A protein has these predicted regions:
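Sec-dependent N-terminal signal peptides
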Residues: 4-13
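A structural "domain/chain start" motif
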Residues: 18-81
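Secretory-pathway glycoprotein ectodomains that are cysteine- and/or Ser/Thr/Pro-rich
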Residues: 24, 117-122, 131-358
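Short, charged beta->alpha transition segments
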Residues: 37-40, 112-113, 278-280
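Active-site-proximal beta-strand/loop segments in catalytic clefts of secreted hydrolases
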Residues: 53-55, 89-91, 128-129, 240-242, ...
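Short, solvent-exposed, polar/charged sequence segments at loop or secondary-structure edges
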Residues: 61-75, 79-139
Length: 358
């Protein structure tokens, strides 16, 4: 079963996790984290405007339910200090849409920070975490946009502190499953296979921007996902999900929408206003996948490359699927054959992590 499936109705996902009963500030690990970060802020008279970025697992791009919890809890805890004004993910997205800065890249931990002045935000809090089953160690950093510096911090929580705060109904084993990404070993192997096999080695004649419509990279079962892209060239696009199980799923174009053209210098969502008639919903199996957009200025050339995939679609399973090796052959054939460069190609990809409800 494909991980990403289209449905006709909009699904409104429930709250990600059950809120625990009120605890004291001393017992709240996220309040401790907030206080530790605030203590490292430079001297200031007005509240510092901080966005809260992504928190990934270890030295991987993968995320888990805890990734979402950390961000949401920090967005609540930081303003309580009266020293921080949190810039929400939607506001960061709006600043990026207006061309202020590349928020999609800066929310990722470890991304180099170039000096940039943005009126709406001064820094981004982001980080990585690891767990040994009894503790969770979080390595955070505040990336300062105007100066280009990074302020680092480290906190260690007891697993039972985290469990009592956000998953009081879970056993220790269940809590550990919520801390680590789904199918982490297989997913990471799949991600490495995609990059090492050079599936993404499409000729880049121009740069395109790609992000999820809501700026997230981790999604719960039943939630909808949409991809937003922008190109400096009018071009035709295909959206492909390279799954950890070795299959590659063509999400777009599909039986509900076949118009692949996106205009020059305009953000377009797939699915969205211009590309409507279908939705993409998160379903099992869960893990972390590479979602890739392939762009081409020649529709016939693009469609030729995905024609074989499209023939695999059925009424019950409308998204065509191909094995990894066949996709490698197609991508390499497309770039090798078009040596004239009269047809322009490009690609962009992101990692999306998913997990089940509960």
């Amino acid at each position: 079963m494909n991980r990403i499936i289209a449905y006709a109705l909009v699904f409104s996902s429930p709250c990600l996790y059950a809120q625990a009963e009120a605890t004291t500030q001393k017992e709240d690990p996220f309040q401790k984290l907030s206080e530790s970060l605030v203590a490292k802020l430079p001297e200031h008279q007005k509240p510092i405007k901080l966005g809260v970025g992504n928190f990934v697992y270890g030295d991987t791009p993968m995320m888990s339910p805890l990734s979402v919890v950390i961000r949401e809890e920090l967005e609540i805890a930081l303003p309580k200090s009266n020293q921080v004004k949190v810039i929400t993910r939607s506001n960061l997205d709006q600043l990026e849409m207006e061309g202020e800065f590349q928020a999609t890249e800066l929310v990722e931990p470890g991304t180099a920070v170039e000096k940039v002045t943005v009126e709406g935000v001064e820094g981004i809090v982001r980080g990585r975490f690891v767990s040994d089953g009894t503790t969770v160690t979080l390595y955070t950093e505040i990336a300062w946009l105007q100066g280009g510096e990074v302020t680092k911090d480290k906190v260690t929580w007891k697993m039972n502190e985290v469990t009592a705060r956000v998953w009081p109904e879970k056993s220790a084993e269940q809590a550990q499953e919520a801390v680590t990404p789904q199918n982490a070993e297989q997913s990471m192997a799949g991600i490495e296979e995609v990059t090492n096999a050079k599936l993404l080695n499409v000729r880049k004649d121009f740069d395109i921007q790609l992000k999820t419509a809501d700026g997230e990279r981790v999604y719960e079962e039943g939630s909808n996902i949409s991809f937003k892209m922008k190109s400096p060239e009018a071009c035709h696009v295909a959206v492909i999900c390279h799954q950890s199980d070795g299959n590659s799923v063509v999400l777009f174009p599909n039986k509900w929408h076949k118009d692949t053209l996106i205009p020059k210098d305009h953000w377009v969502s797939i699915p969205g206003t211009l590309k409507s008639g279908f939705e993409i919903e998160i379903a099992e199996p869960f893990g972390s996948d590479v979602v890739q957009v392939i762009a081409c200025t020649d529709q016939n050339a693009l469609m030729k490359e995905i024609k074989g995939m499209a023939s695999a679609a059925t009424e019950d399973d409308p998204y065509p699927v191909m094995t990894r090796g066949m996709v490698v052959k197609k991508v390499k054939a497309a770039t090798a054959a078009d040596v004239s460069k009269q047809t322009l190609w490009s690609e962009k990809h992101i990692i999306v992590s998913t997990f089940p409800k509960g």
